[in-house]
UniProtKB/Swiss-Prot annotation:
Signal peptide: none annotated. It comes from Bos taurus (Bovine). It is found in: Cytoplasm; Nucleus; Mitochondrion. This is Evolutionarily conserved signaling intermediate in Toll pathway, mitochondrial. Ubiquitinated on Lys-372; leading to translocation in the nucleus together with RELA and NFKB1 and expression of NF-kappa-B-dependent genes.
Length: 433
């Protein structure tokens, strides 16, 4: 070892011991002095790592979910009239933009407004969504170079813009030119919200008329009109006739004999009437339900009048003339290229069910209400008066409704002494006989 290396080692050792001695002279205990290795000596990295201390660190406090500011919640408080409509919602958004010029906390406010839209009934209004997008500052979140476009530039703001577009997609709201212009001003063309908009414009136009049985956007509020729409939606026969057997009566109506009287609306086609007239009176028919039918966000419950399937030996097979048979036309087609292993038939599992004679939508699902429907059907179907009708009713939640015999409470059991006396009397009578 040269003399220069020896001098450097001695100087480093003196500095390390000098630091320890100086802290000891100030009154600190020796156990609390941090270990300081000489600068010239080699030591492991664990000696300098603060995590290797034997003293446990306090646990980090759990992160709480981010909540909207109380100031934003006050903007959506109901007005003096208490009405939650589009005017009050737009007023709350305008108050935020007027009193918050720098638009601090605009992301939290937009998330809060998206949650409040269903309460105010504006979740399907395109102008309200454009009003929320207009809250974003313009020309601030646009990418300035290629790296901003590759990586998620201003991720929280872009995720908020995507959330607005996703809620529009969930409610079937088609963006327009104003929506596209706002996104170009806010995030630019090469951004994720703009990519979401392009995808929505592509698929919305293709799936707009994909449903062969479309449902109107605004459903009627009247239960009778809603029931008629549901029945027309279920019945494929255009010649079927919708009949209102009973109109609902208001509870405050003075002329109402029964204030709980509900609506009864039914539908039946001429083919169903002829099938019911040919039905065997010895076989009962059944009233089953309620079954659910969803029309957008409204659920309608309906009942059916049906019969069991006839056994195979009693079915009447309708003979079709050979020249009318479309399945086996009068021509000979010999396919010589086919072999015995070629099978062009599809395996279709068809479940045969009994005939359905009528469908009904009623406000109540009890037997008394449905009996009025059967009485109304007897006016146009006289054969129904001779056919026994059995009610198979179940609850709306899938639970079976108890019958009238199950609702009656069983008689209380007799006392024990009385049972023994009755048994002894029966034995004496049997012995005398």
């Amino acid at each position: 070892m040269s003399w220069a290396q020896a001098i450097l080692l001695a100087r480093g050792a003196s500095r390390g011991w000098g630091g320890i001695c100086s802290t000891a002279l100030t009154g600190a205990p020796f156990s609390q002095v941090p270990p300081q290795a000489p600068r010239g000596l080699r030591c492991s990295a664990a000696a300098h790592n603060p995590d290797s201390s034997l003293v446990p660190h306090p646990p980090e406090p759990p992160r709480r979910p981010v909540k909207a500011l109380a100031v934003h919640e006050e903007l959506f408080r109901p007005a003096l009239d208490g009405a939650r409509n589009k005017a009050n919602f737009v007023r709350a958004v305008q108050n935020f933009t007027e009193y918050n010029v720098h638009k601090r906390g605009h992301v939290d406010f937009i998330y809060l407004a998206l949650r409040k839209m269903r309460e105010y009934g504006v979740e399907r209004d395109l102008s309200v969504y454009n009003l929320l997008l207009d809250i974003f500052p313009k020309e601030v979140f646009r990418p300035r170079n290629i790296f901003h476009s590759i990586f998620l530039h201003y991720p929280r703001q872009q995720e908020c813009g995507i959330a607005v577009l996703e809620q529009m997609e969930n409610h079937g709201v088609m963006p327009n030119k104003e929506t596209e212009f706002l996104l170009l001003q806010i995030f630019g063309r090469k951004s994720y919200p703009m990519l979401k908009l392009v995808r929505m414009k592509l698929w919305f136009t293709r799936f707009k008329n994909i449903n062969p049985f479309p449902v109107p956007r605004d459903l009627p509020q009247d239960p009778v009109d809603l029931a008629s729409l549901a029945l027309r939606h279920m019945e494929p026969d255009l010649s079927a006739r919708v009949t209102t057997y009973q109109m609902p009566l208001l509870k405050d109506s003075p002329n109402a004999m029964d204030p709980t009287e509900t609506h009864i609306v039914g539908i039946q086609s001429p083919e169903q009437q002829s099938a019911l007239a040919r039905h065997d009176p010895a076989r009962p028919i059944f009233v089953e339900g309620p079954f659910s039918l969803w029309l957008r966000d409204k659920c309608v419950y309906y009942h059916i009048l049906r019969a069991d399937l006839l056994p195979p030996e009693e079915r009447e097979v309708e003979e079709i003339p050979e020249e009318w048979n479309l399945y086996y036309p009068m021509q000979l087609d010999l396919a010589y290229g086919r072999s015995s292993w070629d099978d062009y038939e599809f395996n279709i599992d068809e479940v045969e069910e009994g005939p359905v004679f009528a469908i009904c939508v009623a406000g109540a699902h009890d037997q008394a209400t449905l009996a009025k429907w059967i009485q109304g059907l007897q006016e146009t179907n006289p054969a129904l008066a001779r056919i026994p009708v059995v009610f198979r009713l179940s609850g709306s939640s899938g639970e079976l409704l108890p019958s009238s015999s199950e609702l009656e409470e069983p008689p209380p059991p007799p006392p024990e002494g009385q049972e023994e006396e009755e048994d002894s009397q029966q034995r004496q009578q049997q012995g005398q006989s």
